[in-house]
Design a protein with these regions (language model features):
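A structural signal for short, hydrophobic/glycine-enriched beta-strand patches
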Residues: 2-137
Length: 137
């Protein structure tokens, strides 16, 4: 399998994208426990660290399972780069690993989500497969 190499973006552009991602993942509403707890949180593989953190935080705080979907696909290298740049997560080895495997390691090591609360789908190679394979999990 070959990975698509995208053109490099300037650091200023990447910083702006990460700022928008952090804002979108922000949860600044007063906490009111939901009347009905969700059955699980679904996290599709991606390289936006704030959205990864938000999904892990929600699963951890509510004590519910986290389904993580993502194999190795066209944007996996972006996740590898984001992890390498992250001040805490950069100790995780990423090369050759599926996105879901990396994100599950983050969930366990940094968010203390127990292994029995993690469902890992690591075969999908794109967003459509993330959804289809997650539904089957």
């Amino acid at each position: 399998m070959s990975l698509t190499i995208f053109p490099s973006l300037p650091d200023k552009t990447l910083a702006a994208v990460n700022t928008v991602g952090a804002w979108l993942a922000e949860d600044n509403l007063p906490y009111n426990p939901p009347a009905l707890l969700p059955d699980l949180v679904v996290l599709a593989g991606n390289a936006v660290i704030p959205s990864i953190d938000a999904a892990c935080r929600l699963a951890s705080e509510l004590g519910i399972p986290l389904l993580i979907s993502g194999g190795i696909g066209h944007s996996t290298t972006f996740l590898y780069a984001a992890i390498a740049r992250h001040p805490r997560y950069n100790r995780i080895r990423t090369t050759g690993k599926a996105e879901a495997t990396i994100l599950a390691e983050i969930a366990r090591a940094f968010w203390q989500i127990p292994p029995e609360h993690l469902l890992v789908e690591d075969q999908s190679t794109n967003c459509g497969e993330n959804a289809r394979f997650s539904a089957a999990a």
